[in-house]
Amino acid sequence: LLQTLPRFHSNDFLACISLVPGHVQDAPYVEKELGTIYDLENYLSCGRFVQFWEVWNQSKSLPAASPSFESQVRAGILIVVSSTLEKVPVAKMAAYLGVNSDQLQSTLTEAASIAGEAVSIVSCDAETVTFAKSIFNAPESDSNQQPLRFSDIVSIVS
């Protein structure tokens, strides 16, 4: 289940949790760990990245999913942030990725290389991280679109 968390923007977690029998999910010996994993997945899928890192850092009882687990999670977060926002303040981006501001540049480089073509960082200065514009993070209206008149809509509805 932990290995599905870096791909939180897909349905991998739901697919894997459905494979775990109900009596195992309800067993007292895994209840705390499963609850924590559910919380971690919820924080990621809801975009509550800062809370994810807080809970992750407190959950030392969970086994490491893989040696590059945290890097893969950061790449997933970077994909979501870059497809949603064009510019992000450095302090917020560092908090989203669970690192200090002075570690941000190297963390961004590593996460962007893992994310591949899904992320294009234009610049990272002292104040702002800027991503390449896309139709999702910088939507523009279609200048060729003709305005709709009320009479056109009425003829369709009636």
Which residue stretches match the model-derived regions?
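Charged, E/D/K/R/S-rich low-complexity terminal regions of large eukaryotic assembly subunits
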Residues: 2-158
